[in-house]
Amino acid sequence: MSPSDVPINWKRNLTVTWLGCFLTGAAFSLVMPFLPLYVEQLGVTGHSALNMWSGLVFSITFLFSAIASPFWGGLADRKGRKIMLLRSALGMAIVMLLMGMAQNIWQFLILRALLGLLGGFILNANALIATQVPRHKSGWALGTLSTGGVSGALLGPLAGGLLADHYGLRPVFFITASVLFICFLLTFFFIRENFLPVSKKEMLHVREVVASLKNPRLVLSLFVTTLIIQVATGSIAPILTLYVRELAGNVSNIAFISGMIASVPGVAALLSAPRLGKLGDRIGPEKILIVALIISVLLLIPMSFVQTPWQLALLRFLLGAADGALLPAVQTLLVYNSTNQIAGRIFSYNQSFRDIGNVTGPLMGAAISASYGFRAVFCVTAGVVLFNAIYSWNSLRRRRLAIE
């Protein structure tokens, strides 16, 4: 029996990759609450300079991740996904360790760029599970896996803030590096993959990858959907605290209220993603995708008219429940429309679009709020998501007509 014929316990791999995604999500978000403070500690002074450098060190990670993802995706298709998980976890652990030793802002900026170049654990975890899980359980498995990163991202800022208050800023980077090294060890000892390496000559070129897709236009529309999902999420991030302050008036605990309202969509997504993923396996992920996009539009519009923070919190909770279905549905449709041979690259291209959305979303939100006010951001974002819903519906309708 060849290595590729040995059965894989995909449920164990799903459990271990979930833990890995949880630890990675937590590790990334551990340092997020105090990034501007660390930038200031590295010698940046002045309001405008601090804003500029904080924005740079935040966005450069996503920018370099967008550039590097296709390369790592191609390497994953050649060498296997487990080795990419190991490479990512260990590489990020080393970079985080070095961040805690940075002496000036330029060193820190370069290390943030390296973090983007060496990242990709969650991307490769999705590709690994997508190629191992039975197709009829893809929605449930990918939905469940997505809750790992979401859970970590929810707990990370809270833990990071507490650790920074007790131990200072630099030690948090060392703790984060330790968390990522634990992720490396879990992957090394417990994840199993039967993968026969492919030589560079045997690898499909980009044109051949596109030609091998069942529906290239649909796959492109799914990439665009991923980008717009992240644009919609990111556009609200820069103005959320300020909008909450406008709604709440003079209250002493504005930071707590803002933090709670920022986190409720993640909690809702955590609850909804596996259930909606399983429903998608029954009725089709395309139906889940379109309905979730339409619900998102219907929830974004009233956010521009709310009068209290609690009204905003309720709408954001419902929005999070709908959003919890979006990326797993996109990933499931990508699985349906590609082969295992090119899964790494398809997921990496999707990650690049996601990273571009992470960069452009906050820029769009900040620009709109500066010109037209906070409330306009929600209306414009709703319009962008509505366009995406129509575009996605049209792409899926064409696929259905082509099949018929």
Curated annotation (Swiss-Prot):
The chain crosses the membrane at residues 19-39, 56-76, 90-110, 113-133, 144-164, 171-191, 222-242, 254-274, 288-308, 317-337, 376-396. It is a multi-pass membrane protein. Keywords: Cell inner membrane, Cell membrane, Membrane, Transmembrane, Transmembrane helix, Transport. InterPro entries: MFS, MFS_dom, MFS_MdtG_subfamily, MFS_sugar_transport-like, MFS_trans_sf, Mutidrug-R_MdtG, Tet-R_TetA/multi-R_MdtG-like. The keyword Repeat does not apply. It is found in: Cell inner membrane. Its main location: membrane. This is Multidrug resistance protein MdtG. It comes from Salmonella choleraesuis (strain SC-B67).
